[in-house]
Amino acid sequence: MQDTTLEVRLAELESRLAFQEVTIDELNQTVTAHELEMAKLRDLLRLLTEKVKATQSSHMASPSEETPPPHY
């Protein structure tokens, strides 16, 4: 009787292990995909930041070139 109980418990543990291995593989794939996406987004953010800085510096006058605001 005890051997049957041990066999059932062992089978249950093996089943859980198999499901855990599948889950770990899926999570690993998800993490890898997210890392690639984050790298692309970092590159895009860097590019957009450079474009915004270039646009701001070319379209905005320096404070010394600005005319003073009218006084009331």
From Swiss-Prot:
Residues 54-65 have a biased composition (Polar residues). Signal peptide: none annotated. Gene3D superfamilies: 1.20.5.300. It holds the Pfam family SlyX. InterPro entries: SlyX. Residues 53-72 are annotated as: Disordered. Belongs to the SlyX family. This is Protein SlyX. It comes from Enterobacter sp. (strain 638).
